[in-house]
Structure formats: C-alpha cells, structure tokens
Amino acid sequence: MGDRMAFRFDSGATWLNLLATRGTHFGEHPVERMPTVGRLVEWLDAVELRPVRKVSAADLELAWELREALRPVALATVDGVPPDSAQVKALGRFLDGESVSLKVTDRLVRTPPATATDALGRIARQAVDHLTGPEREFLSVCPEHDCRGVFSDPSGRRRWCPNPACATRGRVRAHRARKAQSE
C-alpha cells in the first residue's frame, strides 16, 4: 500500500487522526484512506477501538459521516468563528450511546466498544472535549489550500500539518518566492 494510503496517527488525538483518513480533502483528487469496511476495522484496531460486534458497510458510512461532521466544526473552532448549527447537530447525534467502563489489568484499560457506533461515539466525545476545552487553543490548520488538515500543536511552532508533503510544498513555494524577489 502506498504512502498516500497509509493511515496517519500523528495529528495529536484520535479524532484528529480520523480527519486525516481523508487526505488532500480540499484538492482535486482527495485520498480516501478508509474506503472499505476492512480499512475501517484496521483503523479502529490501530486506535484501540475495535468493537466486539462485526463492522458493517453502514458503520463505514457512519464513520465517514462523523469525520465530515467534525471537519467544519474543527475548522470553525480554529478560525475562531461559531460553527454552523446544522454541523453541530450532525456531530451531536454521535454523542448518545454507551458509557465507557474501565478495568485494571497490568494497566488501566477501557472495555472495547460493543459496536462501531459506540466506538464513533467515543471519538465524538473526545472531539467535543477537545473543541470545547482549553486544548482547543493548540489546534492549528495546515495552510496548504488542498489540505487544511487540523492538528494539535502544543508547541505553537508548526506551520504545516504533520504530512511531510505539505511542509515540502510550502517550503519550496516560499523559497521560489524569495528567489523571485531577489532577482
């Protein structure tokens, strides 16, 4: 599987990594990294949220729906503007559901979600906590017009999302602009 299809787990939170399952979202050729139920299961495994029950095509549709409900709310939060009420309502429907129980083995662990819907609910709750709490101040958006990926940057020093392609394109463009000015 090519690098373009590889999952990204470097955005700073599970819900931000869910946003990254669709690359170059605003470009002419977006990259869907989670096109199948199998890929959704792989992603849920990687974020330790694989449900007990089998994941279905309807669950994949719900995962896409959550991702695309989160994106505009996150971008509005970073831009410091109120999100559209319809977007908030779309996100809100994921917040109902099971509660998380914890157990102790050799470490503190949460019980696996019963269904993919429950897993998506946990992700939605994490996102809402992040978007409404003090950590929202650490959210940044990649300036690349085709990316606009949201990521957490507690250091305040990142200019681009964790995708190396965005930083490379941005640096090359800046270098060419400086070179053109000096000529």
Regions found by a protein language model. Name each.
Residues 1-141, 148-152, 183:
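Short helix-coil boundary/hinge micro-motifs
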Residues 141-146, 163-165:
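Short, cysteine/histidine-rich loop/knuckle motifs that typically chelate Zn2+
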Residues 138-140, 157, 176:
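A structural preference for long, well-packed, hydrophobic secondary-structure segments
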Residues 165-182:
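Basic DNA-binding region of bZIP-type proteins
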